[in-house]
């Protein structure tokens, strides 16, 4: 067990903090490529100091919200996409832990990491509906650009502490890229 200083300077034991329940979304186009956005870094957030900033959409599940509903809400809030159809839901939740220097700081200092339920969708719309900066509905922009990426490349594009999550997600949904 190792402790780290939180935002107040008090020591924070990661084991004492819960995982934040979240959803993750792999959106594939008709060519089997995956949508990835380059994160805008906010000082003190989980991406602060990172150079590998490409990620798929993800976000928190609101209290009482169904994960499938949360996935569609997060997708719209972050990308503006609505023209999607569900391909598959991962059977298991996937956890990641924040690196020690971010425990007690990132994720509002309340979580040790995230537990994520992943969904794969097919994008069936026109790319003109994709809006990231600004995204629709007055939501805060999380990405400054986006691209369709080969699925196999994703683990090497994400911040290192999320790499194992992306390796599991790619393994789960690999058959959908064919």
Swiss-Prot record:
InterPro entries, per database record: Nudix_hydrolase (IPR020476), NUDIX_hydrolase-like_dom_sf (IPR015797), NUDIX_hydrolase_CS (IPR020084), NUDIX_hydrolase_dom (IPR000086), RppH (IPR022927)
Record's keyword annotation contains Hydrolase: yes
Single annotated GO MF: bis(5'-adenosyl)-pentaphosphatase activity
Gene3D superfamilies listed in its UniProt record: Nucleoside Triphosphate Pyrophosphohydrolase (3.90.79.10)
CDD domains attached to this UniProt entry: NUDIX_Ap4A_hydrolase_plant_like
Alphabetized PROSITE patterns for the sequence: NUDIX (PS51462), NUDIX_BOX (PS00893)
Assigned keywords, A-Z: Hydrolase
Domain of life: Bacteria
Its EC number(s): 3.6.1.-
Cystine crosslinks: none
Domain Nudix hydrolase: 18-171
Cofactors (names): a divalent metal cation
Chain positions of motif Nudix box: 59-80
Top-tier EC class: hydrolase
GO biological process, one term: ribose phosphate metabolic process
Functional summary from the UniProt entry: Accelerates the degradation of transcripts by removing pyrophosphate from the 5'-end of triphosphorylated RNA, leading to a more labile monophosphorylated state that can stimulate subsequent ribonuclease cleavage.
Similarity comment: family membership: Belongs to the Nudix hydrolase family. RppH subfamily.
NCBIfam families referenced in this protein's UniProt entry, alphabetically: PRK00714.1-5
The protein, known as: RNA pyrophosphohydrolase
Source lineage: Bacteria, Pseudomonadati, Pseudomonadota, Alphaproteobacteria, Hyphomicrobiales
Gene responsible for this protein: rppH
